[in-house]
Amino acid sequence: MSVATGDKPVNSRQEILEGARRCFAEHGYEGATVRRLEEATGKSRGAIFHHFGDKEKLFLALAREDAARMAETVSENGLVEVMRGMLEDPERYDWLSIRLEISKQLRTDPEFRAKWTDHQSVLDEAVRVRLARNADKGRMRTDVPIEVLHLYLETVMDGFISRLATGASTEGLSEVLDLVETSVRRPD
């Protein structure tokens, strides 16, 4: 497949990312073959790898983009509200399946894990800043360190994402989120 004349490199790069996101979400990391990536993006192998070098770099670019988007959302709304949004409109959160693939790669690929740590730190910092800001405003419980609250929320988020992405029942999850929110807030 060839790139249409007149395509700007930035547009081409973004089109590749959007198509690759769909391909990885549908087929997983291992199943996203070069042929499938070409079909999903409408771009040639040469164009894809010109922008990203290889499949892992393409996947990491998606992961970095998703971490930045999620960090922005978390800093504005908080992690529990992000989960509420996912529950209400999972289609809006197109990175859910990619996040599961990231978890799989983290478990099975030590090199990927080392590269991912930098991307995850962006999200971790956004959560910590949000928690610290709420603690300073007197909204958070003070008997538990911020790092423990962060780990707790991250653990809940991972399970929440797994449940949504695998199509498990969402019955009762809204009440679970109420419980999580209450558990990190300062008692009145």
UniProtKB/Swiss-Prot annotation:
Q: Name one GO molecular function term.
A: transcription cis-regulatory region binding
Q: Give all residue intervals belonging to the HTH tetR-type domain.
A: 10-70
Q: Which residues bind Mg(2+)?
A: E181
- Listed InterPro entries: Homeodomain-like_sf, HTH-type_TetR-like_transc_reg, HTH_TetR, Tet_transcr_reg_TetR-rel_C_sf
Residues holding citrate: L79, V80, R130, N134, R185
- Highest taxon in the source lineage: Bacteria
- Taken from the record, one Pfam family name reads TetR_N
Annotated keywords: DNA-binding, Magnesium, Metal-binding, Repressor, Transcription, Transcription regulation
Segments crossing the lipid bilayer: none
Gene Ontology terms: biological process? regulation of DNA-templated transcription
Extract the PANTHER family matched here.
HTH-TYPE TRANSCRIPTIONAL REGULATOR RUTR, HTH-TYPE TRANSCRIPTIONAL REPRESSOR RV1474C
Q: What does this protein do?
A: AcnR negatively controls the expression of the aconitase gene acn.
Describe the protein's quaternary organization and the partners it interacts with.
Answer: Homodimer.
Entry protein name:
HTH-type transcriptional repressor AcnR
